[in-house]
Every structure is written in structure tokens, then in C-alpha cells.
């Protein structure tokens, strides 16, 4: 049975036990090392690590999308192919959100 040696916290994953002299030279710069910055928000091949959104952010996103992207429930006579039934409202009302109003003018 082979026993694996535990790595000390000062050792980086790519260093062996005899290569500690490089980490001493870097000192405090280890946190700001460009190679380590890459690992902060990303994983393999540039895919971004999933992070849970805060409630504040979720609320903001939900509020922003709500105006014109919300799917409206149509009654049974509002079908795309065969428009039979009530023809009361022929004019379609425009969305009044800021984004849509800006596109109209």
C-alpha cells in the first residue's frame, strides 16, 4: 500500500517539496500573480464558474425583463393560424417600456 504525502499550504500544486525557494521570492505578490488571477472566475477553457446571484441582482434582472418580454396569455380565439372568434381589438398596443419607446422614435 502506498501512502501519499500531504501537501503543505505554502506549497503550490505544481511544486514539489524542494522547490519552495520560488514562493519565498514572490512574497506578497503571489495573490496578484497573473496566472492566479485567471483562476478567480473561470474554469477550464474559459467557461465561467457558476455563481449564485444575490437576491438584489435577481430582483433587478426580473424587473428589467418584465415589461416587454413577458408572455401574455391569449384567449382561445387568438391563435396564429386561423383567427376566428372575437375581432374586437384590431389595433395592437405598443409596449410602453423605455427601451421600446426609444426604438420607435
Swiss-Prot record:
Annotated Basic residues bias: 43-74
Record bears the keyword Iron: no
Assigned keywords, A-Z: Chromosome, Developmental protein, Differentiation, DNA condensation, DNA-binding, Nucleosome core, Nucleus, Phosphoprotein, Spermatogenesis
Tissues with expression: Testis.
Protein's name according to its UniProt entry: Protamine-2
Domain of life where this protein originates: Eukaryota
GO molecular function per UniProt: DNA binding
Record's subcellular location: Nucleus; Chromosome
ATP-binding as UniProt keyword: no
Source organism phylogeny: Eukaryota, Metazoa, Chordata, Craniata, Vertebrata
Single GO cellular component term: nucleosome
Assembly with partners or alone: Interacts with TDRP.
Signal sequence residues: none
Region annotation Disordered: where it falls in the sequence: 1-74
Regions of compositional bias (Basic and acidic residues) in chain numbering: 33-42
Protein function: Protamines substitute for histones in the chromatin of sperm during the haploid phase of spermatogenesis. They compact sperm DNA into a highly condensed, stable and inactive complex.
Originating organism: Rattus tunneyi
GO biological process, one term: chromosome condensation
Residues carrying Phosphoserine: 8, 10
Record's comment on post-translational modification: Proteolytic processing into mature chains is required for histone eviction during spermatogenesis. Transition proteins (TNP1 and TNP2) are required for processing.
Family: Belongs to the protamine P2 family.
Gene that encodes the chain: Prm2
